[in-house]
Amino acid sequence: MLYHPSVAPDLEWLADDRGLGIDDVITLHSEATYFAYATGFAPGFCYLGTLPEALQTPRLDTPRATVPAGAVAIADAQTAVYPCESPGGWRLIGACPEPLFNLSNAPPSLLTVGATVRFEPISETDFRALGGVMP
């Protein structure tokens, strides 16, 4: 996962709001192991928890009209990866370069209820090499 302000418009805000450095946010988010509690909202959208307390923050007051596929986001005590472009009110802190939902795959979603997930920080070079697109 790429943690970089160019793909994560709320990363700097979150660090400032929580009194943390960006590296602290990355460490806290990437060192936790998350449990997939439920799917919903959009096909392949998996609610992961529990977010470290230091990162827990409310949703945006006004949702964004468009959140790109692969956006890694947090809201309250949960984190998630948007599987497709959609509206969304979660705070964006990173991006996943690989698609998580594809109807051609069986099963179509890489994340399923009951799975455990960890986010591995990667460089911008690796993000691009894995198919990630920078804005």
Residue ranges and their predicted role:
Residues 1-135:
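Glycine-rich active-site loops that engage anionic ligands at enzyme catalytic sites
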